[in-house]
């Protein structure tokens, strides 16, 4: 089984993950824009038991999403890098920030969610997997 590693900007927090993500996307919601300081967040979701924080401590911030649901955001206490997401709607799964992996050339075939909130200057290739808002329950059946 593939193992991948990553960490925060200052190196205090390190993680290891087993396997491939079950879900991956670029989220263009306003909260992800503000959280990352960028146009979107790259989110890779794994079963929570496949993710191990190997060093460092995380601080948690709970926020409301554009959908109205809550999400726990875990970040480095020292440098503030966002590393892990825990959306209430995805029980048993955790999201890892794509930019925090040591190697990123394996990340591909992203779809886009919350496209209705994307910046006007950002072009997104039309794809039926892209969502104007977030996922619906039908996407998980």
Role assignments for model-derived ranges:
Residues 1-141:
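A short Gly-Trp-Pro
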């Amino acid at each position: 089984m593939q193992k991948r590693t990553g960490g925060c900007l200052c190196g205090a927090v390190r993680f290891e993950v087993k396997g491939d993500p079950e879900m991956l996307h670029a989220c263009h919601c306003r909260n992800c824009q503000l959280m990352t300081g960028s146009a979107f967040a790259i989110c890779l979701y794994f079963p929570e038991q496949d993710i191990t924080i190997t060093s460092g401590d995380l601080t948690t911030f709970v926020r409301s999403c554009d959908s109205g649901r809550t999400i726990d955001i875990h970040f480095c206490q020292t440098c503030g890098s966002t590393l892990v997401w825990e959306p209430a709607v995805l029980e048993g799964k955790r999201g890892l920030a794509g930019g925090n992996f040591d190697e990123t050339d394996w990340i591909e075939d992203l779809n886009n969610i919350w496209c209705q909130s994307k910046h006007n200057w950002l072009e997104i290739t039309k794809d039926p997997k892209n969502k104007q808002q977030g996922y619906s329950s039908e996407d998980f059946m």
